[in-house]
Amino acid sequence: MNLAKRILQGEQLTKETVLKIYEDTNIDTLDLLNEAYILRKHYFGKKVKLNMILNAKSGICPENCGYCGQSRDIKQKQRYALIPEEQIIDGAKVAHDNHIGTYCIVMSGRGPSDKEVDHISNTVRTIKSQHPQLKICACLGLTNDEQAKKLKSAGVDRYNHNINTSENYHDNVVTTHSYKDRTDTIELMKANNISPCSGVICGMGESNQDIVDMAFALKEMDADSIPINFLHPIKGTKFGSMDDLTPMKCLRIVALFRLINPTKEIRIAGGREVNLRSLQPLALKAANSIFVGDYLITGGQPNQLDYDMINDLGFEIDYDTCENKENKNEVSRAN
């Protein structure tokens, strides 16, 4: 194949070429993953970036996203308003103590009120005064220009707003907002010099063409960070009984995203534990970033298992991206 070599020499793969490769059953997934690893190693070495999520506001949402346990259609769910500043600040200390590079503050809902943006902004200022090198990612929904400027001024480094799926498949996933609403939000953040983070959820019934289209859309968007989520079906949601993924399919998807976005941070995110299962470590041959700890309303695995996974691969935590560089040997024993 020599895909990695061709890409490093400047070749731009087309959608048609990538789809053909992705669907070719004669191309072994592990061979494809090895091509992705050549690119991952070239641009990121063996380092793994760590991220942590805080669910700062839960279950209060008017949207009908078919994958989400916080959507308006779910009656039994965890509901609480935006938590106090002190709790968010405490979460930042946990992130610092666990060698996390990026701390992600997430809110449910269509978008934040001005009061909520002020609350988050004040909190971020305090966090930055205590942990100046800890990167802050906000995920608050649809925002306006004034709100984006406030977040930037407060010290927010990155803003996450996932496209989730392809433009073609979008209305099968949610109808209360448009695909353009999502892409416009990312463009707004870029206009305000906030690093754009946008990713996908795979396993919602999308086609192979949709998967390829998602990866190219994020390339065209120039997202700095790309989280790849794998559907963790939640009872009562539209996709609650969906079972469309295997560990090998997940690996093939991650490899494809690396081939199309060779220089970007690619993160294996929600659903990795239940979908990749014993093959989680192999995903880091293509991805260079993970979430540590729990997700929004589903649990992750114990932190130490993630540290061990990184060590066992011969990889290492990317200490260049985290503030806490002390006691490295407690979490990283790689040579």
Swiss-Prot record:
Cofactor(s) required, per the database record: [4Fe-4S] cluster; [2Fe-2S] cluster
Residues noted as binding [4Fe-4S] cluster in the record, renumbered to the chain: C61, C65, C68
GO biological process: biotin biosynthetic process
GO molecular function, one term: 4 iron, 4 sulfur cluster binding
InterPro entries per the UniProt record, alphabetical: Aldolase_TIM (IPR013785), BATS_dom (IPR010722), Biotin_synth/BioAB (IPR002684), Biotin_synthase (IPR024177), Elp3/MiaA/NifB-like_rSAM (IPR006638), rSAM (IPR007197)
UniProt cross-references to PROSITE patterns, sorted A to Z: RADICAL_SAM (PS51918)
EC number: 2.8.1.6
Pathway field: Cofactor biosynthesis; biotin biosynthesis; biotin from 7,8-diaminononanoate: step 2/2
Pfam families: BATS, Radical_SAM
Family of the protein in this entry: Belongs to the radical SAM superfamily. Biotin synthase family.
Subunit composition and interactions: Homodimer.
Name listed for the protein in its UniProt record: Biotin synthase
Upper lineage: Bacteria, Bacillati, Bacillota, Bacilli, Bacillales
Gene: bioB
